[in-house]
Amino acid sequence: MPKTVGVAVSNATFHFDKLYTYAVLPEHQDKVRLGSMVLVPFGRGSRARMGVVLACDAEPEHSKLKFLFDVAPASACLTPELLRLVHFLKERTFCTYYEAVKAVIPYGAQYKPTVAADGVTPVLQKQLVRHTENSYRLAGTLPQKPKPTAKQLAAVALLGGGPRTLTELEEKGISRAVLDNLCTKGVLECTKVNKSIDLYASIPLQNEPIVLTQEQQAAYDALLPKLEDAAPHSALLYGVTGSGKTLVFLKLIARCLELGKRALVLVPEISLTPQMILRLKRQFGRRVAVQHSALNHTERLLQWQMIQDGGADIVVGTRSAIFSPLENIGLIIVDEEQEHTYRSESAPRYSAHEVARQRAAENGALLLLASATPSTESFYAARNGRTQLVRLTQRYGGNPLPTVQIVDMRAELASGNPREISLALEDAIRRNLEAKKQTILLLNRRGYQTMAQCEDCREVLKCPKCSVPMVYHKSAHKLLCHYCGSQMDPPPTVCPTCGGKLQYRGFGTQKAEEELAKLFPEARVLRMDQDSTAAKDAHEKLLAEFANHEYDIMVGTQMVAKGLDFEDVTLVGVLGIDSLLFAQGFRAYENVFSLITQVVGRSGRAKDPGFAIIQTTDPDNPVLNLAAAQDYDAFFEQEIAYRKLGLYPPFCGLCVIGFAGPKEIEVARAAARFAALLGQQAAKQPDLPLRVLGPTPGSIEKINDSYRYKLTVKCRNDRRFRDLVRSTLDCYEQEKLPSKATVVVDLCVIPRNNARRLQFQ
């Protein structure tokens, strides 16, 4: 029973983020433990703030300690493993303790300050009320007189296998009246339990045998010893699109459960969760939980509580699911591991890969990365023996990879076709419709038209708060900024600079949908983008409708490009890829290769062969041609040579230090001063490999009235480098510069085994 505790408080800035010592009243001492959520008085006014206990019996900083106001119930206490993750995130991502706490527990499980009924005493209140339901268990024998009814006998028989909730019993035809009657007779006992919610109860358990091909079985056999070993291991499952990686997942999960352990499955986007959940629920039944941001707060809390209470053996979800309170983990799967969505863009700026690696180490689990287009860093580590490499080279069922045609859009325009859909693609879609097959079209631009440009001065109409063009959305008849949400309603028709006429140009998913309707009036067209999937459960509903042949053509952004499996999709078209091909950043080619390979792989996954058309103005581009050939190994050799020459990951770590503020000149000065301080601190450690680039304006210079600059630091991501950044942040804070910019540190994580081999010339 601790008498003093060290507490990390909410809303602390990075430089004041430490443990503050508080005394514990006698009535709270038996409730406080490491990981407890508490309410504390903070600052001169002793205002109530949330906090988490990270040390017990802490040494007092002075004799006059303040007392804790309140302590949350034990059910809100962070588990030892989640506590260690909080410290891990704090050390690795430059976040505050409480930012890390908010990442590992969902909103609904958190508490907030309020006052007691007396209107004075500060107390804790739960963000959401936890729902409960009745649970029944056998408490005695069923009397034979009067003669038991059939329903009573059925209830007793069901409960002979253990406690059941009211919901479960009602699903079996046992009414509450029957149960209450048995409770009155002393046959049953009723208690309140936290309500568990099965979001996919309609999916029937099939539990069919998992039949693998010879190649899949070989992959499973290669991974099995790592799964069965109590030590942590990592592996990369590299398989061509349609090779049946998911079947290998299912077999590994089944063995993991047989070993008495649990499994965690990560997917990069919400749109990919329905198909993965369908496979898992059919195979493993009710004990599958879901964690992603499309769930409402109540659903997410109930799923989280189900996991915490041990009611789930498998958790599937997006990036944040890596923090699920799952214990005794034996297997962590990161599907489509190359996707950038596994990195958080807000504090804490973590990589799900790195957290997964940490949890695998904590649990002695197998971390399995999987992809048809692995990240260059992951494949480099696997090829060099730092992680196990397992390959699947054949499509499931022996189907060939899709045939790919590259169409030169310059020649298309010269021949008199001004449309964004080439004649070759139009003809292929028409033939596909006649064959009663389905088509997927990728166009990675939302909206109707992507910019408004003056015919006279050529000025492009930009968002007043951001340095990006406004996008016309025809369905809403307004211009929207996709970064800050600013609107122009109605859309202007004259240039605000010179008064000339505005010409709307570009081609987004809304316009593609309209053009398809004109070309193929008999076809049913589905649009999948952020606008059409904004409603709750929209991803699941629309994908299910496409699977049921309620649509013939699906056009969408990146969410249609990967992980989807529709047996009647035999044609894929790629539109507007050039904007990504010439994007900034050292990963631009990798991203384009992955996107094209993945979307082309959506076709021809069943008995019918697949065909794909890539439209471009650069038909000789080697990346496009390698993607068309689905030749990852050749692409990797080209990419790794470029990375080595330019000193990019995996040959170094990258740390991007961002600066933002309302006045551009002050942001630029702050970035330059920080760069100077970093150089001064680095001079004290001349053996520390470091290369600083910048400061330079951000790739988008202004977002939401905030100007952005950045320093790019090529480094070895280890404790010494992170300590260097911290000391520089401290020096920067102590200088008390007027109107300093906000500073954000974002480390690009690479496999540590690679980083140790860093050598700067």
Q: PLM features: residue spans?
A:
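Short secondary-structure junctions
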Residues: T13, F520-A523, L678-R691, E735-K740
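A short, contiguous, amphipathic alpha-helix enriched in charged residues
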Residues: T4, D17, V32-L34, A424, ...
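A general secondary-structure signal for short beta-strands and their flanking turns/coil
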Residues: P2-T4, D17, S46, K436, ...
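A carboxyl-terminal module marker
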Residues: A676, Q680-I703, Y707, V743, ...
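Accessory, non-ATPase domains that flank or precede helicase/AAA+ motor cores in DNA-metabolism machines
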Residues: M1-S371, R383-N399, Q681, R719-Q761
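Inter-lobe coupling/hinge segments of SF2-like helicase ATPases
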Residues: N207-T213, Q217, D221, A230-A668, ...
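Solvent-exposed, membrane-proximal periplasmic/extracellular interface segments of envelope transport
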Residues: P60-S75, T696-G698, K702-K714
